[in-house]
Amino acid sequence: MDDKEKLPIIIKHWIEHNESHLEEYRQWAGKAGEMGLDGIKAWITEAIKAMEKSDSILKEALKDLEAR
């Protein structure tokens, strides 16, 4: 398998990997909020938004790659 064949597999893996972490981040943001750590919750929430943006970009890259 050459790199061109591997690339969509790798991108799909990255997306799935990120999504699995997002669930955990959401849980811990909630826990931080419950502990009264609103600043920490805000930082984690910001990280969630950044990772969601990253996933969106990776999905566009995958879509573009699959259209070729």
Where are these regions (language model features)?
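N-terminal acidic leader/helix
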Residues: M1-A29
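Short, charge-rich amphipathic interface segments used for partner binding and complex assembly
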Residues: W28-D64
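Short acidic DE-rich linear segments
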Residues: E66-R68
